[in-house]
Curated annotation (Swiss-Prot):
Keyword annotations from UniProtKB, A to Z: Cytoplasm, Endonuclease, Hydrolase, Metal-binding, Nuclease, Ribosome biogenesis, rRNA processing, Zinc
SUPFAM superfamilies from the UniProt entry: Metalloproteases ('zincins'), catalytic domain
Name of the protein: Endoribonuclease YbeY
Native species: Magnetococcus marinus (strain ATCC BAA-1437 / JCM 17883 / MC-1)
Gene name as annotated: ybeY
Gene Ontology annotations of biological process type: rRNA processing
Length: 147
């Protein structure tokens, strides 16, 4: 397992893709294996299978909450992202995408969950989250992952 705490201060917070000013953000990232992620997925989501990424926010959002802007100021710990290495690697190969691009997409996807987005809440929110992902990845010079 590989664990790191990332501080997102460079291109991402200044990106117009967000639509608001962000304080420096900290995210703990754990690159784990399918077995460990499957156990966490079963425990916290009731799904006994591995998934590519799990997001655990430091602050819980209400079920119907929309993402709220984080205003500039002190660094804020958003939460934890846990990725299943084998699943991410397999998906990248199946989708004929470079591993690093797929991994970056999942990190953006998971971070948006930490910011309050939830594509499972409604179709409208799924479209909003997908549009944000595409815009952020474009700012990083990466292609639309949904094509």
């Amino acid at each position: 397992m590989v664990q790191a705490t990332l501080r997102l201060e460079s291109q991402w917070p200044a990106s117009p893709a967000f639509g608001w000013a962000l304080a420096p953000l900290e995210v703990s990232v754990l690159l784990s294996d399918d077995e460990a992620v499957q156990a966490l997925n079963a425990q916290y989501r009731g799904k006994d299978k591995p998934t590519n990424i799990l997001s655990f926010a430091m602050e819980e959002e209400a079920d119907d909450a929309m993402p709220m802007p984080i205003m500039a100021g002190e660094p804020r710990l958003l939460g934890d992202l846990i990725l299943a290495y084998q699943t991410v690697q397999r998906e990248a190969a199946e989708q004929d995408k470079p591993f690093d691009q797929h991994l970056t997409h999942l990190l953006v996807h998971g971070t948006l969950h930490l910011l309050g987005y939830d594509h499972e809440r409604s179709e409208d929110e799924a479209q909003q989250q997908e549009a944000r992902e595409i815009a952020i990845l474009a700012q990083l010079g990466l292609p639309n992952p949904y094509l």
